């Protein structure tokens, strides 16, 4: 695949063209994490599943926005076996988020967004 097709601008355009479509962006958007944060904040129909990248590598801006402006849009993802579950759970805990936010990230947001 061509990496430019993974740029958050493609998701932004899709979300603008189909405002009633619920879109779940997968992976953290690297190397365009800041742009993906902007798309998730700007588009009400875009949520974000954070698989394929260990939380210990999340940039500070993403860590901050997960507990603030993005708290209702972030979903846990593993991409197992590329990253072991033990490591993922440990690194998520090490971020120090409150239990209520962790419940949102690990299941609450997905249940709401996906209608489960």
Which sequence ranges carry the predicted segments?
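Mid-to-C-terminal alpha-helical segments outside catalytic/metal-binding sites
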Residues: 70-73, 83-116
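Conserved, mostly hydrophobic/aromatic
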Residues: 27, 48, 79, 102, ...
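Short glycine-enriched loops at secondary-structure junctions
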Residues: 30, 81-82
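Catalytic pocket-lining loop regions of alpha/beta-barrel enzymes
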Residues: 1-75
């Amino acid at each position: 695949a061509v990496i430019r097709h993974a740029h958050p601008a493609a998701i932004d355009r899709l979300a603008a063209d189909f405002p009633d479509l619920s879109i779940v962006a997968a992976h953290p958007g690297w190397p365009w994490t800041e742009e993906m944060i902007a798309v998730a904040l700007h588009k009400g129909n875009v949520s974000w599943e954070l698989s394929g990248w260990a939380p210990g590598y999340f940039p500070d801006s993403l860590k901050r926005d997960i507990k603030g402006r993005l708290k209702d849009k972030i979903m846990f993802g593993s991409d197992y076996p590329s990253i072991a579950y033990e490591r993922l759970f440990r690194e998520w805990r090490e971020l120090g988020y409150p239990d209520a936010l962790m419940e949102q990230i690990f299941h609450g947001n997905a249940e709401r967004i996906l209608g489960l």
